[in-house]
């Protein structure tokens, strides 16, 4: 199908395209189109095992773009993807009703492990997992540091907090996980210039374990 037909504003895909355009305002048209198609494939398949998986099961059926185009935009395109977090913060803060503007917002930092069955993946390593259920406290895989924004909203006349993921970054051991988390927090803090109460929560876990021999946080 043509791009014009696919992005018709009267269709669900067209409305999704309009919504995500705010994330791609500074990108070239081809790059923005490729990134949106990737997002659309993830939403459709509810999974993202790999770019090849997305291409074989969805993308190849709706676009003439090659698989390499999608690899390129994720790996080599000169795009500052960290700005996506700032855009998400701005959108999320608009969800706070006027009556709750003085309530605190929370930035929650955590880490998560993703196991890998191979050993030749980039940055894969043996990681300590305090929540492992495989008979060992270690797994072979990747570690990601995440930041989530929680904002107050009304839910049946009670204050409830809506949780919105802002971003994930792979820990590559070039810096500590806390330093990685701090860089993500610094990235989004300018968006909170109008907020007086911002609470940063660090989820206790492997992210903040001490190396006994080195006496420092890892």
PLM features per residue range, with description:
Residues 1-218:
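Conserved, well-structured functional cores that handle cations and Mg-NTP chemistry
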């Amino acid at each position: 199908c043509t791009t014009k037909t696919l992005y018709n504003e009267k269709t669900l895909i067209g409305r999704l395209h309009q919504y995500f355009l705010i994330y791609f305002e500074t990108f070239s048209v081809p790059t923005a189109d490729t990134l949106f198609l990737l997002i659309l494939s993830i939403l459709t398949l509810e999974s993202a095992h790999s770019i090849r998986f997305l291409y074989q099961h969805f993308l190849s059926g709706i676009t003439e773009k090659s698989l390499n185009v999608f690899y390129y935009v994720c790996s080599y395109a000169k795009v500052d993807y960290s700005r996506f977090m700032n855009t998400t913060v701005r959108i999320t803060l608009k969800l706070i009703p006027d009556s709750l503007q003085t309530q605190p917002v929370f930035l929650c930092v955590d880490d998560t492990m993703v196991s890998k069955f191979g050993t030749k993946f980039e940055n894969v390593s043996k990681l300590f997992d305090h929540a492992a259920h495989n008979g060992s406290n270690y797994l072979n895989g990747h570690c990601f540091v995440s930041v989530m924004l929680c904002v107050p909203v009304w839910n049946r006349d009670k204050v409830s907090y809506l949780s919105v993921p802002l971003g994930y970054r792979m820990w590559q051991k070039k810096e500590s996980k806390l330093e990685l988390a701090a860089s993500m927090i610094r990235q989004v803090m300018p968006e909170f210039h109008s907020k007086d109460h911002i609470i940063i929560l660090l989820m206790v876990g492997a992210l903040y374990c001490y190396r006994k021999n080195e006496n420092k946080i890892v």
